[in-house]
């Protein structure tokens, strides 16, 4: 748990998703603070349109891969959809994820998961919350800053160690970050949180769904990745 204590005291947290040992080793050697084994692997690895086909076995498999590559780096792993529908099931699955090498699990939701999170924390499982856009539920949300603040405070009372704010906007991010005592992590939202999380394959420009201005900046920065591949192909084709 020393890894997590150090992470929680980091002023600006850089979190990046990862699913394999090679990239995990690369991230550990560079300045990434924490690796997220995200259920985004449903899209990036499996080629599905969403996260709904990711299983517990797959999260465990990829968590083990990442831990082999990054033995000293804090790892947070998503609890996939349908893996925390009861307290008993959630605790069993969370323990399996931690046994695979994770230091913390991430759970999407608010009122619907308060009891689950409280139960996990009481059983010494560290939990990262996730509100705003929640891919497992794929539902639209109202950007009411006071409602978001109330949800964040309730999750803090439940015992979460950190909180991901997904596409909630700068005003909401700032309000929550200033009014809770745990680190906040922004996803595609603002620079107003204690840190940011990004999908590795998007950073590398490998995703096919990079459409926003932010995404286009990522793609521009990643153009150099094509050079070694293109050079190899050109050498063979001479």
How should these model regions be labeled?
Residues 1-238:
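Alpha/beta enzyme core
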């Amino acid at each position: 748990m020393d890894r997590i204590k150090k992470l929680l005291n980091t002023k600006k947290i850089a979190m990046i998703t990862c699913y394999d040992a090679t990239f995990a080793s690369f991230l550990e050697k560079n300045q990434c603070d924490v690796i997220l084994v995200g259920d985004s692997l449903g899209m990036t690895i499996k080629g599905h349109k969403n996260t709904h086909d990711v299983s517990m076995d797959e999260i465990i498999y990829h968590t083990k891969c990442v831990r082999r590559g990054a033995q000293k780096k804090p790892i947070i792993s998503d609890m996939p959809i349908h893996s925390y529908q009861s307290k008993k099931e959630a605790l069993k699955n969370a323990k399996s994820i931690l046994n695979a090498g994770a230091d913390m699990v991430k759970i999407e939701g608010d009122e619907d998961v308060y009891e689950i999170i409280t139960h996990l924390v009481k059983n010494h499982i560290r939990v990262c919350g996730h509100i705003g856009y929640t891919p497992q539920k794929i539902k639209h949300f109202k950007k009411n800053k006071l409602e978001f603040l109330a949800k964040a405070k309730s999750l803090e009372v439940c015992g979460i160690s950190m909180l991901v704010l997904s596409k909630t906007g700068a005003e909401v991010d700032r309000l929550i970050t200033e009014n809770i005592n745990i680190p906040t992590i922004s996803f595609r939202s603002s620079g107003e949180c204690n840190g940011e999380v990004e999908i590795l394959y998007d950073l590398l420009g490998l995703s096919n769904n990079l459409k926003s201005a932010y995404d286009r900046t990522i793609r521009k920065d990643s153009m150099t990745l094509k050079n070694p591949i293109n050079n190899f192909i050109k050498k063979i084709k001479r």
